[in-house]
Amino acid sequence: MEEIADKTFFRYCLLTLIFAGPPTAVLLKFLQAPYGKHNRTGWGPTVSPPIAWFVMESPTLWLTLLLFPFGRHALNPKSLLLFSPYLIHYFHRTIIYPLRLFRSSFPAGKNGFPITIAALAFTFNLLNGYIQARWVSHYKDDYEDGNWFWWRFVIGMVVFITGMYINITSDRTLVRLKKENRGGYVIPRGGWFELVSCPNYFGEAIEWLGWAVMTWSWAGIGFFLYTCSNLFPRARASHKWYIAKFKEEYPKTRKAVIPFVY
């Protein structure tokens, strides 16, 4: 009976993730989360960005520690290997990235992160963290699927690593530029910035595309689609922001997030 209830709960959570994407994309076409270059007043109290990132991303780590040991595949080396890229990404996002923000030392008075937005992100990470951890540790049933598991894992891992490299190096460039300009904004140049305004978002989408291939599941596909629904509208808004701010100086050949396409 408990197994049936757990499976029903998992399915409802998965459906929530999958169907949350389209309305999120529509909403973010008209309203951008007020942090970073889109920061604005009227969203209530704020907190230091490093603290916000640490707290709102943290469920991906501690929830995994709580859930994973109780899965049917918790001790399966393949499940542990499969989940490692997810944990590596979120260790960086929860620990390393906030530390990098903290060390950047640019003035933070006008750059507070709204607690309401952090709370929404925290809630999403609770939902998605549960889905991904529970799927890999308990509901995935093709670990013994011969060589297909390894083909999907290797191909997905190559895609994931490529995306993570683009994401991390682009984030590092943005943090460095903001530090050098005392919290101000300049036109990012070099690398993937020559092709798109937001290569950090492009890289993250590529990561979760690789994750979808590795997991070969609706859980992975749902995460990838929601990532695109969340980040691509923001990338488009950031692209327009750059053009409005820098006008003729901004490279006209750059796209928003997908090279040569969008």
UniProtKB/Swiss-Prot annotation:
Pathway participation: Plant hormone biosynthesis; brassinosteroid biosynthesis
UniProt GO cellular component terms: membrane
Biological processes per GO annotation: brassinosteroid biosynthetic process; brassinosteroid homeostasis
Protein name: Steroid 5-alpha-reductase DET2
GO MF assignments: 3-oxo-5-alpha-steroid 4-dehydrogenase (NADP+) activity
Annotated effect of mutating E204K: In cro1-2 and det2-1; loss of activity, enhanced sensitivity to abscisic acid (ABA) during seed germination
Signal peptide residue numbers: none
InterPro entries noted in UniProt: 3-oxo-5-alpha-steroid_4-DH, 3-oxo-5_a-steroid_4-DH_C, SRD5A/TECR
UniProt function note: Involved in a reduction step in the biosynthesis of the plant steroid, brassinolide (BL); acts at the second step in brassinolide biosynthesis in the 5alpha-reduction of (24R)- 24-methylcholest-4-en-3-one, which is further modified to form campestanol. Can use progesterone, testosterone, androstenedione and campestenone as substrate.
Enzyme Commission no: 1.3.1.22, 1.3.1.-
Phenotype when the gene is knocked out: Brassinolide-reversible dark- and light-grown defects; small dark-green dwarf plants with a limited leaves expension due to a reduced number of cells per leaf blade. Small and less elongated seeds due to a decreased seed cavity, reduced endosperm volume and integument cell length. Delay embryo development, with a reduction in both the size and number of embryo cells.
Similarity section: Belongs to the steroid 5-alpha reductase family.
Keyword line: Brassinosteroid biosynthesis, Lipid biosynthesis, Lipid metabolism, Membrane, NADP, Oxidoreductase, Steroid biosynthesis, Transmembrane, Transmembrane helix
Catalytic activity reported: a 3-oxo-5alpha-steroid + NADP(+) = a 3-oxo-Delta(4)-steroid + NADPH + H(+); 5alpha-campestan-3-one + NADP(+) = campest-4-en-3-one + NADPH + H(+); (22S,24R)-22-hydroxy-5alpha-ergostan-3-one + NADP(+) = (22S)-22-hydroxycampest-4-en-3-one + NADPH + H(+); 3-dehydro-6-deoxoteasterone + NADP(+) = (22R,23R)-22,23-dihydroxycampest-4-en-3-one + NADPH + H(+)
Places the protein is found: Membrane
Bilayer topology term: Multi-pass membrane protein
pH-activity relationship: Optimum pH is 6.8.
Activity modulation notes: Inhibited by the 4-azasteroids 4-MA.
